[in-house]
């Protein structure tokens, strides 16, 4: 298939690549990063702007960049110009650049040198370049002339897994080669007697029991570090490697990684290693782990670089992320865990509870009823009071706020509550609230205006106490405001509380896992039909007289809104209000985002904490606008950042079942707990956050399986969409309106990510991610795309409903709203609300007669989704589209979405294909004076296509849907309207397009690399042709049919008909190919090689006449192409 000269249009060009970062190097205050064949340059001058300066596209052609080597300058000045050798795979190129603080200019570039072997290392030798190749040979190359000067092999021509070149001249050049035999071979290329004469190894070093992946030599100390497949790092004393015959001694064997170690770097005082476990470890030269950097996701950290002067470590991962970390001695160090030495003969009794009043005062109570204070500035214990009534059972809680407002509360097993001013404990005020045990205490603070203390007693009664201070500040007043009543449950007490801004409602969580909304002032809350009943204190179960005498206090106010068992049976651990939303955490390893609308609680999104954190204890908002999650992972207390996916603090405390407390301010964070009868304290200066910088956000930790464009947001010039390029280097006309494409991706890492892709910047911003799936996400579908304010609203923004599906027969529906926000780097804010979900095994478990049915395979996977929007006036089904799913168990299933996606119901299914269904696609047929018809096409692993008439099937009274064999099961779809045997094996891509003649073009791509294109005609019989009362069923037939057997060299995973005359296809052979249609068999026009391996999905869309079309390719990374009409 030769290209016709007249049809070179369109030509696709790459504008964005998100691939694993495989090369990093610090040059002065700049960072060079290799992503695929592209070179990224960052400015690391923290006094200026920390951002990308330049992206040099396609520098190494089709090779991936694995490293950079900068030519040493005689004066050591690399601040203005640098000569850089860029290498990777089998390619090498030398580039001379001139750079400043905010620009980079390419002065000269050599040709691409294609080697016949893999390049493991490159070193500058007196203006030339020495290259270590994959079969143990060294080549000397002149980059200016572009010719090879020397080619010296070793006598041992084994395959290498790594290499390191040492020396500044050809005479002293030394190569340390890591052979696949797990040995280090040290030899000297200059000792060859004649050209191309093999050189025998000078030394062989063994010790590792796996392949050696990386090595680093520190000349000043004569040390060599090696990283291996055996998950260890070894340190060798080698002396001066340039001198033959030296002794090699193993002086360190470091085990700390849980998987293979990819990279190692030796510094004067540290050893840095990174591996497949996504952890970067900092070691001392004695083999002690000093720091551990965790944050990357996926299959490992592929590249590391260091900046010794600034004490920085830079890591690049498989998730396309680049992070900068501070070595010990920089930033805000942790002070570690220390014992506060409570045990003393002068302090009798055993500790019962501990809490924090601010970050520098610790309160503790003993089993003899004594309350003690420890001041971190004074560093001594002080007894505040002793009360024998609190000796057998005592609860202790300090008021929230920076310094606890100087208040704490005690409660005992006889219904007594005492509020104690910490500075003046003699002014304590007590009230007897109940006749029985006080189960829990919690504080609720509204700014500096209102402070409430909630105490749970018998029978689910919560006493709400209002705390106020005298004008002199030396006395406090405690007044019972009201009483609330919890819903019935076995363990009927509240666990946490918070004010809901502006302060009309109080949010509480209970031990049963429910979240409830109570009115703060019940006397002012008048809601007709609410059903809340107010009773007096004398009527309340277990109620007794308080300090107010026999005054009747209204009590028993029930919640105005309840989310029952939101966190399961283990209980709610915290509730927090921030940014107009309510966040709740629980011991079900998750946290919920909620909001209140019309006095009712509504869940927005459920998020999972880090793996292993089953007890989520709370969350905190940090100054940069993000949040951190507090929780327990086995016997460790963990502070985890959802934004950076990093465990910021880890304290081995023994678990969350002991008494503990946490407090944080901008100056410091503190965590105290009881262990072995002592009060232990962990403090870290600088608050919860750690001083690391995310140069670029990671995308997904595993392969991207699906990509779908949602829509476009247009931002005006007032939002100033940031550009990666310097303004001087922008092309004319590219400074137009800020068009930003919103794209969603699904991945094997079980997450769905919402991306913003500006058309003018060549960048990508991860707006948010959804983590509701328990297995991989395989398919996405979008419907109901609109604007936040409706069709009449001209303000920028985007709303859409998204359906995601994948492994474990799980499907989720959620809504996405994107609005302008000038405070974010992307200038956009994204809000996601989870609407509904469905799992086949859960659906089966709910059936009454399930013992009579065959259970659905829980390992069923949804392979593809299609939205089928029927007519709104159809009877019987109500408003909402259908979602068609291709299933691995051989079924085509139809789900009905109702109530704007809040109800997801399995309606019908068919096992017509009897094998794995790979693709589904829906399209509509419209003809003059005829009813709009909705047709579904499904494709299976045998290469067959089936077409279903959904309009007829969904009509009321239609006989197309067969009744199920048992009540509660879905309907049966019957037989399809037409089948076509398009391929000899599985169909991985499918698309249709209506033609001007009223027909439909159907294109499919197969696993054998073939394409199949045919024209489908839909004909409706005349009413007089129908037999009696028979339904008018459309007749489908194929008019023209063409096949291209060898369109690609591998699976065709994406096909899109752009117009009746143009089609584009993508394959695992990494070629994006354009085909000419309309003149018989599809004709090859041109092809572009892309850099994403194992492409699984493709989506194309028109942007505008000025920006043409865009195409997103998803696989082991993401790449965006564009072409112009």
Swiss-Prot record:
Gene3D superfamilies: YVTN repeat-like/Quinoprotein amine dehydrogenase. WD repeats lie at residues 53-97, 105-143, 147-189, 200-238, 247-285, 289-327, 335-376, 381-422, 425-470, 476-520, 559-598, 604-642, 645-684, 739-785, 848-897, 905-950, 974-1016, 1040-1077, 1083-1125. It is found in: Cytoplasm. GO terms for molecular function: enzyme regulator activity; tRNA binding. One of its GO terms (cellular component) is COP9 signalosome. The modification N-acetylmethionine is found at residue 1. Belongs to the WD repeat WDR6 family. Together with methyltransferase FTSJ1, methylates the 2'-O-ribose of nucleotides at position 34 of the tRNA anticodon loop of substrate tRNAs. Required for the correct positioning of the substrate tRNA for methylation. Required to suppress amino acid starvation-induced autophagy. Enhances the STK11/LKB1-induced cell growth suppression activity. This is tRNA (34-2'-O)-methyltransferase regulator WDR6. It comes from Mus musculus.
């Amino acid at each position: 298939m030769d290209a016709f000269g007249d049809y070179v249009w369109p030509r696709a060009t790459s504008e964005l690549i998100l691939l694993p970062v495989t090369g990093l190097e610090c040059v002065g205050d700049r960072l060079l990063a290799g992503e695929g064949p592209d070179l990224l340059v960052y400015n690391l001058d923290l006094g200026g702007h920390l951002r990308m300066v330049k992206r040099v596209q396609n520098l190494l052609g089709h090779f991936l960049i694995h490293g950079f080597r900068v030519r040493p300058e005689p004066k050591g000045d690399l601040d203005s110009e640098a000569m850089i050798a860029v290498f990777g795979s089998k390619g090498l190129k030398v580039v001379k650049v001139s750079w400043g603080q905010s620009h980079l200019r390419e002065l000269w570039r050599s040709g691409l040198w294609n080697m016949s072997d893999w390049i493991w290392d490159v070193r500058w030798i007196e203006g030339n370049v020495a290259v270590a190749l994959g079969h143990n040979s060294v080549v000397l190359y002149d980059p200016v002339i572009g010719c090879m000067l020397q080619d010296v092999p070793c006598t041992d021509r084994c395959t290498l897994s790594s290499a390191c070149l040492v020396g500044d001249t050809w005479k002293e050049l030394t190569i340390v080669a890591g052979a696949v035999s797990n040995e280090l071979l040290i030899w000297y290329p200059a000792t060859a007697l004649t050209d191309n004469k093999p050189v025998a190894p000078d030394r062989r070093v063994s010790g590792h029991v796996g392949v050696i992946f990386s090595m680093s030599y520190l000349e000043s100390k004569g040390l060599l570090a090696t990283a291996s497949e055996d998950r260890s790092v070894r340190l060798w004393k080698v002396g001066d490697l340039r001198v033959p015959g030296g002794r090699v001694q193993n002086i360190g064997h470091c085990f700390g990684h849980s998987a293979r170690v990819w990279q190692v770097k030796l510094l004067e005082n540290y050893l840095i290693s990174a591996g497949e476990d996504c952890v970067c470890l900092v070691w001392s030269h004695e083999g002690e782990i000093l720091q551990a950097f965790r944050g990357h996701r996926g299959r490992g950290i592929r590249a590391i670089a260091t900046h010794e002067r600034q004490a920085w470590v830079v890591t690049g991962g498989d998730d396309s992320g680049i992070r900068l970390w501070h070595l010990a001695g920089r930033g805000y160090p942790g002070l570690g865990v220390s014992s506060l030495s409570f045990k003393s003969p002068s302090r009798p009794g055993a500790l019962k509870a501990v809490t924090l009043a601010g970050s520098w005062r610790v309160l503790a109570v003993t089993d003899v009823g004594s309350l003690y204070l420890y001041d971190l500035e004074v560093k001594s214990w002080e007894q505040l009071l002793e009360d024998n009534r609190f000796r057998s059972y005592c609860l202790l809680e300090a008021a929230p706020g920076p310094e606890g407002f100087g208040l704490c509360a005690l409660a005992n097993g006889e219904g007594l509550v005492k509020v104690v001013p910490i500075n003046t404990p003699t002014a304590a005020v007590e009230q007897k609230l109940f006749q029985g045990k006080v189960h829990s205490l919690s504080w609720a603070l509204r700014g500096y205006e209102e402070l409430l203390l909630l105490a749970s007693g018998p029978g689910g009664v919560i006493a709400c106490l209002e705390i106020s201070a005298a004008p002199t500040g030396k006395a406090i007043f405690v007044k019972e405001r009201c009483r609330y009543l919890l819903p019935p449950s076995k363990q009927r007490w509240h666990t946490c509380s918070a004010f809901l801004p502006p302060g009309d409602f109080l949010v509480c969580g209970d031990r049963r896992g429910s979240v409830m909304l109570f009115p703060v002032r019940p006397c002012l809350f008048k809601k007709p039909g609410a059903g809340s009943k107010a009773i007096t204190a004398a009527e309340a179960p277990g109620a007794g007289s308080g300090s107010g005498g026999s005054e009747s206090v209204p009590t028993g106010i029930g919640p105005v809104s309840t989310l029952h068992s939101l966190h399961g049976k283990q209980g709610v651990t915290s509730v927090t209000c921030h940014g107009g939303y309510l966040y709740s955490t629980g011991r079900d390893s998750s946290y919920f985002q909620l909001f209140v609308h019309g006095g009712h609680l509504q869940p927005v999104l459920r998020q999972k904490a880090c793996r292993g954190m089953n007890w989520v204890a709370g969350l905190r908002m940090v100054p940069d606008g993000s949040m951190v999650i507090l929780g327990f992972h086995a016997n460790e207390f963990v502070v985890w950042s959802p934004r950076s996916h990093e465990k910021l603090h880890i304290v081995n405390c023994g678990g969350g079942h002991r008494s503990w407390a946490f407090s944080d301010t901008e100056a410091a964070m503190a965590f105290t707990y009881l262990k072995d009868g002592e009060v232990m304290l962990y403090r870290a200066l600088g608050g919860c956050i750690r001083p690391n910088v995310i140069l670029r956000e990671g995308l997904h930790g595993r392969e991207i399986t699906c990509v779908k464009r949602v829509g476009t947001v247009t931002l005006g010039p007032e939002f100033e969409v940031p550009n990666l390029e310097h303004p001087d280097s922008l092309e004319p006309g590219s400074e137009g309106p800020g068009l930003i494409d919103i794209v969603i991706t699904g991945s094997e890492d079980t997450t769905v990510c919402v991306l913003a892709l500006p058309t003018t910047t060549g960048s990508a911003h991860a707006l948010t991610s959804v983590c509701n799936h328990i297995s991989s996400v395989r398919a996405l579908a979008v419907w109901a795309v609109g604007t936040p304010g409706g069709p009449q609203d001209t303000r920028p923004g985007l709303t859409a409903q998204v359906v995601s599906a994948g492994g474990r027969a799980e499907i989720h529906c959620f809504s996405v709203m994107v609005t302008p926000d000038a405070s974010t780097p992307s200038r956009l804010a994204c809000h996601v609300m989870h609407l509904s979900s469905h799992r086949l095994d859960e659906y089966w478990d709910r059936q009454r007669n399930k013992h009579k049915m065959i259970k659905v395979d829980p390992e069923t996977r949804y392979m593809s989704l299609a939205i089928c929007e029927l007519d709104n006036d159809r009877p019987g089904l109500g408003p909402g589209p259908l979602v068609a799913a291709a299933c691995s168990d051989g079924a085509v299933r139809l789900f009905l979405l109702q109530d704007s996606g809040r109800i997801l119901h399995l309606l019908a299914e068919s096992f017509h294909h009897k094998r794995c269904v790979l693709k589904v696609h829906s399209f509509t047929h419209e003809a003059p004076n005829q009813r709009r018809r909705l047709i579904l096409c499904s494709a299976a692993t045998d290469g067959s296509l089936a077409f279903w008439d959904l309009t007829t099937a969904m009509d009321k009274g239609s006989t197309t849907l067969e009744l199920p064999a048992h009540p509660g099961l879905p309907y049966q779809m019957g037989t399809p309207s037409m089948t076509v045997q398009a391929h000899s094996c599985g169909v991985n891509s499918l698309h249709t397009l209506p033609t001007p003649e009223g027909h439909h073009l159907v294109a499919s791509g197969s696993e054998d690399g073939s394409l199949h294109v045919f024209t489908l005609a839909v004909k409706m019989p005349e009413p007089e042709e129908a037999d009696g009362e028979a339904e008018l069923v459309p007749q489908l037939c194929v008019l023209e049919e063409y096949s291209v057997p060898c369109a690609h060299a591998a699976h065709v995973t994406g096909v899109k008909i752009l117009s009746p005359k143009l089609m584009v296809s993508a394959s695992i052979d990494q070629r994006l190919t354009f085909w000419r249609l309309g003149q018989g068999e599809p004709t090859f026009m041109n092809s572009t090689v892309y850099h994403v391996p194992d492409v699984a999905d493709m989506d194309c869309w028109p942007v505008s006449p000025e920006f043409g079309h865009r195409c997103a390719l998803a696989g082991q990374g993401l790449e965006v192409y564009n072409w112009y009409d």
